[in-house]
Amino acid sequence: MPVSRIAVGAPGELSHPDTAKAAVAEFISMLIFVFAGSGSGMAFSKLTDGGGTTPSGLIAASLAHALALFVAVAVGANISGGHVNPAVTFGAFVGGNISLVKAVVYWVAQLLGSVVACLLLKIATGGAAVGAFSLSAGVGAWNAVVFEIVMTFGLVYTVYATAVDPKKGDLGVIAPIAIGFIVGANILAGGAFDGASMNPAVSFGPAVVTGVWDNHWVYWLGPFVGAAIAALIYDIIFIGQRPHDQLPTADY
């Protein structure tokens, strides 16, 4: 059972060189992802006079986030595992693939990467508004939580199937592409309703820069619940019993 493999970790992990390298890698990957993803939305709005919320804007956001996440995961895979998402890190922790100590380090790096990316966007665009996540008219907070749970479940299930599963074989090569694709597809499904975050850090950066925190908890609760469910289901049903080990940095 995954619960038996959950590890708090030792304080010494905080000062280990590999942990520091992994944190820097997560910071940079998140910066790349948020700068390209959020920046594409800002550029589309500028070019279309505020058309970022149109169907074409949704398609552009889906494509930009899919491509950016593919790159962000790929460049971080050999160093940190390329989580680029606090929910993915939480799913790895629930499945016994990363210690709590190291997970906290990842979370801090991911959140900082998102904030810095949004600040750089604001500076580079001369003060243009960075789009914060919000619920569309008629969408309640708990409706959005369900959206985030289901979408993040799909994301983390994909992560486990293509990157974490020790039986993945050559399938691991396409992990960054598959992960980017599921995020892009989910944006097409949920973007019009709650922005389709699936990633607390992606929501956190714009909230810090804009000061808009309305329903921000939705973008933490939903992804964390979805990630935990996916990790438990995949680990219990498809991976089964195995000794506790750290998430291999060579794959994800």
Curated annotation (Swiss-Prot):
Q: Name one Pfam family in it.
A: MIP
Q: Where in the cell is it found?
A: Vacuole membrane
Q: Keywords of this protein's UniProt record, alphabetized?
A: Membrane, Repeat, Transmembrane, Transmembrane helix, Transport, Vacuole
Recorded topology in the membrane? Multi-pass membrane protein
Q: In which tissues is it expressed?
A: Expressed in leaves.
Q: Which Gene3D superfamilies match?
A: Glycerol uptake facilitator protein
- Tell me, using the record's free text, what induces this protein: Circadian-regulation. Expression is higher during the light phase than during the dark phase.
Q: Which PROSITE patterns match?
A: MIP
Cellular component GO terms held in the UniProt record:
membrane; vacuolar membrane
- Placement of sequence motif NPA 2: 199-201
Domain of life according to the entry: Eukaryota
Name a GO molecular-function annotation.
water channel activity
GO biological process terms, alphabetically, are: water transport
Q: Where is this motif: NPA 1?
A: 85-87
Segments traversing the membrane: 24-44, 57-77, 115-137, 144-164, 173-193, 220-240
Q: Please quote what the entry notes about the protein's domains.
A: Aquaporins contain two tandem repeats each containing three membrane-spanning domains and a pore-forming loop with the signature motif Asn-Pro-Ala (NPA).
PANTHER family, from UniProt?
AQUAPORIN TIP1-3, AQUAPORIN-8
The family this protein is said to belong to: Belongs to the MIP/aquaporin (TC 1.A.8) family. TIP (TC 1.A.8.10) subfamily.
The record describes the protein's role as: Aquaporins facilitate the transport of water and small neutral solutes across cell membranes. May be involved in transport from the vacuolar compartment to the cytoplasm.
Specify the protein name.
Probable aquaporin TIP1-2
